[in-house]
């Protein structure tokens, strides 16, 4: 009787834990006139199964992509980052692209989504790119 009660108690927890495993959030800040870029960027991020959240900030000729990798794949962050960077470099050779899995860059990119002043966004993207280069 105890085994059956424990089984009925724990089964819902396992089902709830598995139900939201495939959700992925992708947000994009796009102030350019290029309309197809948004769909392409969303597509590349969505195709990356290891990523559960992504933010892309596209201003002028700059593209900053911040990704959050699923926790159990944290040891593969660098490889995932390099693979996605290569995809964007091939797809957009005329853009300055930076892909990062660093949480601080993700957090700062998230703040940029709310920013209304485009010049401030451009300046912040430059600062974030410099910060990312310093960390490597």
Please give the residue ranges for each predicted region.
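Positively charged n-region of N-terminal signal peptides that target proteins for export
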Residues: 1-4
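C-terminal motif of bacterial Sec signal peptides marking the signal peptidase cleavage site
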Residues: 14-17
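Post-signal peptide N-terminal segment of mature Sec-exported envelope proteins
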Residues: 27-48, 52
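Short, non-transmembrane amphipathic alpha-helical segments
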Residues: 38-44, 74-96
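Short edge beta-strands and adjacent turn/loop segments
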Residues: 46-68
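A short interface-forming secondary-structure element
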Residues: 64-78
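C-terminal low-complexity, charged extensions that often adopt amphipathic alpha-helices
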Residues: 85, 89-136
């Amino acid at each position: 009787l105890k085994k059956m009660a424990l089984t009925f108690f724990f089964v819902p927890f396992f089902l709830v834990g598995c139900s939201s495993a495939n959700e992925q959030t992708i947000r994009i800040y796009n102030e350019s006139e290029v309309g197809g870029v948004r769909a392409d960027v969303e597509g590349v991020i969505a195709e990356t199964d290891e990523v559960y959240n992504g933010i892309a900030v596209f201003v002028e000729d700059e593209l900053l992509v911040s990704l959050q990798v699923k926790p159990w794949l944290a040891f593969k962050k660098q490889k995932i980052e390099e693979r996605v960077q290569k995809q964007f470099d091939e797809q957009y050779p005329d853009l300055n692209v930076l892909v990062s899995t660093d949480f601080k860059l993700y957090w700062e990119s998230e703040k940029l989504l709310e920013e209304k002043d485009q010049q401030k966004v451009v300046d912040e993207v430059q600062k974030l790119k410099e910060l990312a280069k310093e960390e490597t």
